[in-house]
Amino acid sequence: LIFVLCCFCGIAQAQPQRPKLVVGIVIDQMRWDYLYRYYARYGEGGFKRMLGEGFSVENCKIPYIPSVTAIGHSSIWTGSVPSIHGIAGNNFMKDGKVVNCTADETVNPVGSDSKAGKMSPRNLWVTTIGDELRLATNNRSKVVGVALKDRASILPAGHHANGAYWFDDKSGKFITSTFYMEKLPEWVNKFNKQKLPNKYLSKKWETLYPIDSYKESTSDDNNYENGIVEGEKAVLPLDLPALYKKYGYKILRNTPFGCNLTFDIAKAAIEGENLGRNTDTDLLTISCSSTDYIGHQVGVNAI
């Protein structure tokens, strides 16, 4: 009996090891079948590793319409649906008028003078995973959200995040609002000073592999696609310096380099906020928005 009791005491005292950092990644407009359609293209350390060592939900239901960015991100990070979390679309009726899901006239931009900074999660009625994590640890856990889209950064990060940062087309910088802070952290200023958008827009967009090897997709030059932006053909290679000169920083959103930039600031956030180096679990939410921007232009079967 003594032996048995000691065993149970040992089990009771053993605490499961908690992760130092949880990273949640949403790839906007990525269909489930892409995991298998492009499987041969994936490296061993990315999607193949997730499929081999992780868990794939292959019989799930989306119980709402439409499945747009704001609703999807809110539902993922709150575990609820529009009738509960309050985000009924990217834009929806509120008090008799159409509003942007994250627009907030009571806050001001931080890091820019653009109206793109007048955003917050006030329209989100419930808490996110990050909010609950902060509450559970008496604010010791850190929660940070990053994305090109404001709503894809703000809604996952939630009400009580340490920061949410999104891309400003006017300045080419990542910004936030006074809902979160009065001035940008030094690590964000340092990141913005690198002017990475200029670097990405200084070269052509070319395919990673020979263009005739993309057997999984429709031919590049076809009649089923809109342009990279309205009036510009989406045929690779694309002259990004010329497009940048004509359309400014917003053209970056419609290229794969928008995802590169998103992961660049995600890595900067890990270093700048010391995420994963605390005694409590931290959370970093990342959304790849460029796949959605270009997906609306060229469809689901493009190279």
Language-model features and meaning:
Residues 26, 31, 43-47, 72-73, ...:
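Stable alpha-helical elements in mature extracytoplasmic
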Residues 35-84, 142-146:
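Short, structured active-site-proximal loop/turn typified by the sulfatase FGly-forming signature C/S-X-P-X-R
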